């Protein structure tokens, strides 16, 4: 399949010494030509794709080995990535990034990304990609629990089960932590609320706090292996990774990970190519690899759920993942503004209403 339309801007130095940009139309360029041009470029600079997140390290090592591209990454938040694309447009240094799901449409609105449709485009759900190819989700994270079964006898696979378990709950820093805030928001959905109604979650956690069942501490491997944590709530790609680390550190420990069936927010991360990418062919080639079977399996090795359901995971890896059926009722995050407003409310109300009950 030929590469889909790809418009990029490459920096050229003019006679005045200032940087100018010139459009390079890759509409008619085949995938073979992209590979050839990428080899000539020989390098790629990404943002927001650090080695220790979702096994990006494995993918970049594979891309370097397979295509000979020298890679470097600068870790940034999603907002910082798009800001960098825009601010550097006259002298670009970044080629591509990985942004939170809600930032894909925002990137299009800012006009800082360009289209590319990988050869596996048709196997990606419509909701997970821009129709013009300007962003595409490559993996998902879903709110989940990890429980020390020595402390918790019943599976904690729902907020209702958690409510009735009697165990102490670890969320981390709800005032400042995004994942902890997402856990509270997931709880709101479980009991009939949502971004515009957080009351069910605050009723739930108020009761837990009064019962002494809210852990004031944060998660750490040491606390988990010492048996100080009953259950911790965060994204599945973290709970599964933390499970492995706990078992490695304390072979006798048994950790059970589940998606919260009655309220589990799900958020994806989208690949974007800088409109002004200095190495556009390398960026397109990287997107191609990251959406390939190999690239999707790389994400799964980092315990992120691949966006492509047609990729068959190796049996040894599939056995380590949370079963597919637990994701049936996951709630996708689509409205960034509503989520941001809800998180701000969660942070302020938690500080005012919950923390005093924990002291």
Annotate the PLM regions.
Residues 27, 328-359:
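Conserved C-terminal helix/tail region of periplasmic/extracytoplasmic solute-binding proteins
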Residues 264, 269-334:
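Mature extracytoplasmic/periplasmic domains
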Residues 1-41, 359:
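Short, low-complexity disordered leader/linker segments with a strong preference
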Residues 214-276, 311, 315-320:
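Extracytoplasmic/periplasmic substrate-binding proteins
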Residues 45-60, 72-86, 90-229, 242:
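Extracytoplasmic ligand-binding site segments that recognize negatively charged/polar headgroups
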Residues 23-32, 39-58, 269:
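Extracytoplasmic "Venus flytrap"
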Residues 41, 140-142, 266-270:
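Short, solvent-exposed beta-strand edge segments and adjacent coil->beta transition regions
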Residues 59-67:
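A short alpha-helix/helix-coil micro-patch that ends at or immediately precedes a cysteine
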């Amino acid at each position: 399949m030929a590469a889909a339309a790809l418009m990029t801007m490459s920096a050229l130095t003019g006679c005045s010494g200032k940087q100018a940009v010139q459009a390079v139309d890759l509409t008619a360029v085949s995938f073979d030509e992209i590979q050839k041009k990428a080899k000539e470029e020989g390098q790629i600079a990404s943002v927001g794709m650090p080695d220790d997140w979702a096994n990006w390290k494995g993918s970049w090592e594979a891309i370097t080995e397979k295509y000979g591209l020298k890679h470097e990454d600068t870790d940034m938040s999603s907002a910082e990535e798009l800001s960098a694309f825009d601010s550097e447009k006259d002298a670009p240094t970044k080629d591509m990034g990985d942004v939170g799901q809600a930032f894909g449409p925002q990137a299009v609105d800012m006009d800082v990304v360009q289209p590319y449709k990988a050869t596996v485009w048709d196997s990606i759900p419509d909701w997970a990609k821009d129709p013009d190819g300007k962003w595409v989700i490559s993996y998902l994270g879903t709110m989940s629990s990890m429980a020390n079964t020595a402390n918790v006898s019943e599976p904690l696979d729902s907020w209702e089960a958690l409510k009735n378990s009697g165990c102490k709950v670890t969320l981390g820093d709800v005032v400042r932590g995004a994942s902890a805030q997402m856990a509270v928001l997931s709880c709101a959905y479980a009991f009939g609320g949502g971004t515009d109604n957080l009351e069910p979650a605050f009723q739930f956690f108020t009761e837990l706090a009064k019962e002494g069942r809210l852990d004031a501490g944060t998660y750490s491997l040491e606390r988990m292996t010492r048996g100080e944590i009953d259950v911790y709530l965060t994204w599945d790609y973290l709970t599964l990774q933390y499970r492995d680390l706990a078992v490695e550190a304390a072979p006798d420990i048994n950790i059970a990970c589940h998606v919260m069936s009655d309220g589990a927010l799900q958020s994806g991360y989208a690949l974007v190519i800088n409109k002004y990418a200095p190495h556009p062919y390398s960026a397109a080639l990287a997107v191609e690899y990251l959406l390939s079977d190999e690239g999707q399996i790389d994400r799964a090795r980092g315990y992120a759920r691949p966006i492509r359901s047609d990729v068959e995971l190796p049996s040894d890896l599939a056995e380590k993942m949370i079963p597919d059926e637990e994701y049936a009722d996951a709630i996708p995050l689509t409205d960034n503004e509503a989520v941001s407003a809800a998180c701000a409310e969660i942070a302020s109300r938690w500080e005012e209403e919950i923390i005093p009950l924990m002291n």
